[in-house]
């Protein structure tokens, strides 16, 4: 099985989901196209890692883990984790910042800020929902099942904050270094 297979199994370990829901949850930390997700789900269903029930009202398939799927996740989490892959087009552009016009630099940083402000705005209601769940003593089991998701959303929110602060710092440094030239 490939890494995407294990990621999907991890998502299903939390709760049964449709393929669309899996895509939404995965976007917190993994990118995959719907076609990839459904291809992998079909293969894992054939191999016995997941099964699905068709919702008669919507004709959507709701996927769940089988015992074989639970065992696969349990074994996979013990394996060494691969180094994260980092590809950031913005950073490639920043690498040649000294060659850019000042207006281009300003636009580049403004675009980056806009992107991370948008992501922070998406994270905020998710974070608030999970923090409400955390503080509700009547929903302890639901909090337990959502704890990993909370850690990921919180990390993503913190990274947005850090990225925005870095943009301010880097642009200030650029101006203090290049405005005099």
Language-model features: where?
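Mid-protein regulatory/catalytic core that forms ligand/cofactor-binding pockets
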Residues: 110-181
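Amphipathic alpha-helical dimerization/coiled-coil segments
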Residues: 75-125
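Alpha-helix boundary/capping detector
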Residues: 34, 38, 48-52, 70, ...
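Noncatalytic linker/hinge segments flanking ATPase motor cores
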Residues: 7, 51-53, 93, 103-109, ...
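Basic helix-turn-helix/winged-helix DNA-binding cores
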Residues: 1-90
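Amphipathic, non-membrane alpha-helical segments in soluble helical-bundle scaffolds
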Residues: 34, 59, 84, 106-109, ...
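Histidine kinase transmitter module recognition
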Residues: 11-14, 29, 53, 97, ...
């Amino acid at each position: 099985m490939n890494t995407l297979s294990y990621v999907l199994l991890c998502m299903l370990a939390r709760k049964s989901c449709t393929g669309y829901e899996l895509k939404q949850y995965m976007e917190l930390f993994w990118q995959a196209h719907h076609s990839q997700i459904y291809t992998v789900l079909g293969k894992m269903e054939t191999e016995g890692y997941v099964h699905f029930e068709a919702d008669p009202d919507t004709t959507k398939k709701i996927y769940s883990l089988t015992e074989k799927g639970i065992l696969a996740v349990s074994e996979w989490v013990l394996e060494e984790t691969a180094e994260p892959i980092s590809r950031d087009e913005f950073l490639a552009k920043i690498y040649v910042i000294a060659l850019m016009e000042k207006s281009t630099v300003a636009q580049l940083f403004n675009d980056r800020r806009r992107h991370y402000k948008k992501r922070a705005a998406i994270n905020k209601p998710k974070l608030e929902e999970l923090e409400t769940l955390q503080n509700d003593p009547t929903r302890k089991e639901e909090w337990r099942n959502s704890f990993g998701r909370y850690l990921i959303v919180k990390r993503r929110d913190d990274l947005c904050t850090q990225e925005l602060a870095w943009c301010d710092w880097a642009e200030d440094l650029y101006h203090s270094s290049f405005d005099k030239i």
